[in-house]
């Protein structure tokens, strides 16, 4: 099809590798996890795609180009023929590595400006939703990582604590709260030893489910003394970094003290 004259462009950074992100664009179950039940895509040139929106609206199109894991192009229109007829616009999705993450750039080419304006908010919403759907998969084991992180704070064996943190965290880990400012795992290991010395018997535990938004993980915690009393509470935030071995975390912890004793 000739290039339509009006262009809508959006970008979003997703905390996953291009290969992982591309899978959500080309695998029907993952495509449906983004768009909704009944949505499907045959990710090969000439293949058909369908998007099932709430309320019964359907978008349909034909796949034009598939270049794993970098580029997907398809036509886009509504089965009803209203606003955009089938084949009446073109969507290009390009993926670019950004460190351990991926920058997704979407270009939607349309025939008229009012329709372009009508789709800006829709793509803003859909790409944010997409980033979180991918993060759901990438962070599926986040609860175990968070629990191991808190366990390391109670480990009195420095060598064991070092091994655990090296497995969980990026080497350049930066830790910040009201009482500390550390850089690197060695610095944090020493800081934990100091915390154990001056606050003996205190143990942090996760409270509730781990939450995340577009790759940033949030976990509420309570710091509890050996007599079962809650001494502090707060929220730990971690930005995932994908590694070949495990999901590595650069940690920034912001504690809200409620009265150490």
How would you label these PLM feature ranges?
Residues 21-22, 31, 49, 63, ...:
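Hydrophobic pocket/interface hotspot
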Residues 67-72:
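Short, conserved beta-turn/loop elements at beta-strand boundaries and strand-helix junctions
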Residues 15-19, 141-168:
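Short acidic-aromatic low-complexity motifs
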Residues 81-133, 190-261:
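A beta-strand edge to alpha-helix "cap/lid" segment located at domain peripheries
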Residues 1-40, 142:
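Hydrophobic ligand-binding cavity/cleft-lining segments
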Residues 132-144:
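Short, highly charged C-terminal tails/helix-capping segments
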Residues 18, 37-52, 59-61, 160-215:
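A solvent-exposed, acidic/Ser-Thr-rich amphipathic alpha-helical stretch
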